[in-house]
Amino acid sequence: MPEIIIKMQISDLLRNYYGYDFFRPNQEAIIREVMQGNDCLVLMPTGGGKSICYQIPALALPGTAVVVSPLISLMHDQVETLKANGIAAAELNSNNDSTDEMIIRRRCMSGDLKLIYVSPEKLISEIPFLFSNIKISLFAIDEAHCISQWGHDFRPEYSQLGTIREHFAHVPIIALTATADKITRQDIVKQLHLNGKTFVSSFDRPNLSLSVRRGGTKQEKLHYIYRFINGHPGDAGIIYCLSRKNTEMVAMELKKKGINAAAYHAGLSTEERASVQERFKMDQVQVVCATIAFGMGIDKGNVRWVIHYNLPKSIESFYQEIGRAGRDGAPADTVLFYSMADVIQLRSFAEESGQKEVNMEKLKRMQEYAESRVCRRRILLNYFGEEATHDCGHCDVCAHPPQTFDGTVLVQKALSAVVRAGEKIHIGTCIDILRGTHSPAVVKNHYDALKTFGAGRDHLTRDWQDYLLQMLQMGFFKVAYNEHGAMKVTPQGWRVLKGEMPVQLVLLQKKTDEIPVVHARKVSSKKPKAAEGSLFERLRQLRKRLADEQGYPPYIVLSDQSLHELASVKPRTMEQFGMIHGIGEYKRKKYGEIFLKEIRKVDRQEGEMF
């Protein structure tokens, strides 16, 4: 298909079904690749628009797209959203009764469905039957990191998905994830037999604030959380806890204070968990206190904050969980509580896991993030392989910056030692070389003959540990945990070595008990007028009524962003209504007159006749 036709077709689909005028970075290029029959690995942050990358090709291409998803709740949310946009979609899973399944199969066979969502087990079992007898436009593997043992959420049922290529050699496969480091990405490509491009979007979420609070007793943490929620009146939020016991305790304490909170964990029945999730989606519960299982299956755009009551097990988990907040692009706050008790408990979990070495390394990096005095956003971006050369200016560390000094020579000494040792040493051996210590590893490999041996003996071991951690977090080298923790100099590190880039390191000092919390910077400084705020509330109430009538969560009817724009612009005609962000042709026809009528009604009441 000619490029110009593809561009026109996909732009029309984006406007008509989703109400967007422009694609986000990488979306259009990914869609074109899939429509040309090519495989893709897509890395985009949560809320970055991954689903559009396979949904638009599914609408444009003949046949049915098969979407593999790990959670039934995730499938259900996405199918409901597609239906609300006028797109023929269905889910095939254990929740279907025999009648539902028969109807869905018939719709597949007749070509009526554009997308069908399945679990990995269901896909494998149906390959000889349903999927061998229908025209498949593409396969989309969501949460693709689950296929890799190097990933943070390995799921054995995903490991069979490599057979897709054997049975459907000419059908494009698009694998998508929000969290995968370089090693995990390589493993995904290998396991799924992908032979196309890899697209990596920016992992930066500038609308999220990042804060860490160290230590604190149970009562101090609860007091802070209560004050925090009172500072976010009516805003939906999630509190992640390490144990079921803590989810119940935190929810109970908040309810005592009059906050509408609910606990969510694996100890609840399937029906109880589904009820909590549904009430949260429908804005009937403000706060969910949950173990890590919660949130993966939710596409709720107006979560305004996330608190981690305990330290997460990895940066991947942390990034994915804070990604539940601010999916609509508006400012959102994230706070992480951190204590050594969490580290000890998580270490015991890692020791007992089947991937001890990998999990211990990931926990170590998470602990380093929590203890860091380097810009937190910079740490996250560098961890995921995205070069970040400047501090963000609005995390808690940047808001209260520590004292720094010119550390260029120190960094050059350390990186020179790494290079001269063939990039095969781990951090401990690097320190031995710099300090001039004849450790067994140094003697065995003749590292004491290197020019850099003893070049850093004027600094203590603990000083070098701190400086090397800063260098790692600033992205001057990376740790290859699949090569026994070998240090590898990055392109940014080479620039420092060549004298092309100066470096400021944090001056060592006693650790403070706590870094103050900052709030999300506002994406827009424009304050809504009182009249706009009043109209927004009226429109939000109308949206809730429409959602309840249809059994949808309110955000599926219209997003908060669309409501804010409606309250600000006050469209007078159906054409103007259809130009609002997030309102496609289907929603324009379905809801236009209803919302316009409410806007006119409010205008009359305020004396603004038109």
Regions found by a protein language model. Give the residues of each.
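Short helix-to-turn junction characteristic of helix-turn-helix DNA-binding domains
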Residues: 34, 229, 280, 370, ...
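Flexible coil/turn residues that form the inter-helical turn or adjacent wing/linker of helix-turn-helix
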Residues: 169, 233, 373, 423, ...
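C-terminal accessory regions
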Residues: 362-387, 535, 541, 548-550
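Helicase motor core with emphasis on the C-terminal RecA-like subdomain
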Residues: 2-17, 21-25, 29-51, 58-61, ...
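Accessory DNA-binding and partner-docking regions appended to nucleic-acid-acting proteins
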Residues: 2-10, 358-360, 389-610
